[in-house]
């Protein structure tokens, strides 16, 4: 330095040779660091007062994004230099306003997570593509290598859901959200149920039954939770009538259902237990005839009316 003393464990400005004794750290400009042997630290990582810095071959402290040995690191802004870990908003790194709500994650060694599916971070799972945390409906990488020219129609089973912008946590349980472009109607909100990010989807055309927390629900082949009176697939490749509440839970026993097509209120009965629980009752019950769940009533001027069983 100017006084002729050997600099040890000191930051020194590359521009004006101002020196700082540790534990002070640099504040703007280009900085060098002299180790305990009085030599400039070059081409290596250096831990200084609990923070990690990287110095290039000329000994200059690096800032911003650093590409090194096939890995990407973030060393803060020009007045910082300390290696970062954890969540970093991409806009902070690039200064690009188009990167709003896009997050990156740097592991405990400061390495950017580039392409990884369902990485566990704290209490959630996240997917990263090209270093960016994914949100919303995400086509899984194993499915996305099919080119547009030979790709079949998109299927909801090729996707997982990762929360809204700024969230990114893999979905679990019920979510009322917009559907998938090209699969569902635009701007419509539907209710789905997710397990490990994947929606419950009927594996047959139409609706199929699923048990969630000991309750029965029906989901379509597009993954949509069903409400009201619906037809669903049952065992032996058969179908049956069911009635679901607004919460999607199957209803049993006597039910009064409004028929929007006829404008009339109808009386139905659905099995209350057993393997057929929830299915429309077919046959005589307490002297009343039900056909696939719907009560059959003769008109006011009839004592008897034909019914097909």
Predicted regions span which residues?
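Extracellular adhesion/carbohydrate-binding repeat motifs centered on closely spaced tryptophans
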Residues: 1-309
């Amino acid at each position: 330095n100017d006084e002729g003393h050997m600099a040890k464990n000191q930051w020194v400005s590359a521009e004006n040779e101002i020196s700082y004794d540790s534990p002070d750290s640099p504040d703007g400009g280009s900085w060098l660091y002299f180790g305990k042997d009085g030599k400039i630290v070059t081409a290596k990582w250096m831990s200084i007062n609990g923070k990690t810095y990287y110095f290039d071959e000329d000994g200059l402290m690096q800032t911003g994004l650093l590409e090194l040995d096939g890995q990407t690191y973030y060393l803060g802004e020009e007045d910082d230099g300390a290696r970062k870990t954890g969540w970093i908003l991409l806009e902070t790194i690039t200064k690009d306003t188009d990167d709003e709500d896009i997050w990156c994650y740097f592991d405990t060694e400061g390495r950017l997570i580039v392409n990884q599916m369902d990485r566990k971070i704290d209490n959630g799972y996240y997917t990263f593509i090209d270093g960016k945390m994914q949100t919303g409906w995400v086509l899984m990488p194993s499915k996305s290598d099919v080119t547009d020219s030979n790709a079949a129609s998109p299927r909801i089973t090729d996707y997982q859901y990762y929360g809204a912008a700024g969230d990114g946590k893999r979905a679990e349980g019920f979510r009322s959200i917009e559907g998938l472009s090209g699969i569902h109607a635009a701007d419509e909100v539907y209710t789905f149920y997710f397990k490990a990010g994947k929606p419950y989807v009927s594996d047959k055309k139409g609706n199929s039954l699923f048990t969630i927390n000991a309750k029965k629900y029906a989901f379509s082949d597009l993954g949509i939770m069903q409400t009201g009176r619906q037809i669903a697939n049952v065992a032996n490749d058969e179908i049956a009538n069911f009635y679901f509440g607004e919460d999607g839970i199957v209803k049993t026993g006597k039910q009064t259902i409004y028929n929007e097509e006829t404008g009339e209120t109808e009386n139905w009965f659905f099995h209350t237990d057993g393997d057929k629980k929830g299915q429309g009752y077919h046959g005589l019950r307490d002297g009343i005839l039900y056909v696939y769940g719907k009560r059959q009533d003769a008109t006011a001027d009839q004592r008897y009316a034909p019914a097909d069983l």
